[in-house]
């Protein structure tokens, strides 16, 4: 599939992607999404691709200090108020972006259903949701994801890789988990984590 069909959405969302290193996180997660979609041909490519592209744009509406303090370093950060707020803002901004780029109401509704609760909801709604969730996780196993996220969490790369290794059972698809395991092994090697 030619992913340039999503270029207008990227352009329309660009301003919102400049918060919280989403201009790094989202393109990497989008690439993982395309890999997962190739492995799950029954999933809806447009819905999954648009959902991963837009799922975190709501962070644009949150103060950077709150993002780090409450969104990553608080005791129960996955249930923090800023997590819920960024999901609601993601739905609002995502709707605007998709309308501005000509997507149908049915596509907008399906994408926003995934965005709303993507961090805070305990279980996915369906396969499209599972693929978006796994795509969102996979970038954390790359060297770049480790470099960015260990700063968010205020830990060393080794500590963060150990943290994401413990989260492997949370993958929603077997393919996602296998990709994460392979990427994590490569990251451990590249970052010399057997020493550092």
Residue ranges and their predicted role:
Residues 4-28, 32, 67-81:
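Active-site flanking loop/helix segments enriched in acidic
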Residues 15-43, 54, 64-65, 103, ...:
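Divalent metal-dependent phosphate-bond-processing catalytic cores, especially two-metal-ion Mg2+/Mn2+ enzymes
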Residues 21, 45, 82, 86:
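Conserved acidic
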Residues 29-30, 84-100:
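An active-site-proximal "capping" alpha-helix that borders the catalytic cofactor pocket
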Residues 36, 60, 97:
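Short alpha-helical functional segments enriched in proximate histidine and acidic residues
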Residues 45-77, 90, 110-120:
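His-Asp-centered metal-binding catalytic motifs of divalent-metal-dependent phosphohydrolases/nucleases
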Residues 93-124:
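Internal catalytic-core helix/loop-beta-alpha segment
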């Amino acid at each position: 599939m030619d992913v340039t069909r999503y270029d207008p959405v990227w352009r329309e969302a660009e301003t919102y992607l400049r918060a919280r290193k989403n201009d790094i996180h989202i393109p990497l997660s989008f690439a993982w999404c395309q890999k997962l979609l190739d492995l799950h041909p029954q999933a809806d490519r447009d819905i999954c691709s648009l959902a991963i592209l837009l799922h975190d744009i709501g962070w644009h509406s949150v103060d950077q200090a709150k993002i780090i303090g409450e969104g990553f370093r608080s005791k129960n950060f996955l249930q923090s108020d800023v997590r819920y707020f960024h999901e609601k803002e993601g739905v609002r901004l995502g709707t605007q972006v998709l309308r501005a780029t000509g997507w149908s109401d049915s596509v907008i509704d399906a994408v926003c259903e995934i965005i709303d609760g993507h961090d805070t909801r305990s279980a996915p709604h369906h396969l499209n949701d599972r693929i978006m969730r796994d795509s969102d996780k996979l970038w954390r196993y790359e060297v770049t994801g480790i470099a960015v996220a260990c700063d968010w969490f205020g830990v060393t790369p080794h500590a963060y890789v150990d943290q994401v290794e413990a989260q492997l059972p949370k993958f929603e698809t077997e393919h996602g988990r296998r990709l994460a395991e392979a990427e994590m092994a490569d990251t451990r090697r590249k970052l010399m984590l057997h020493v550092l």
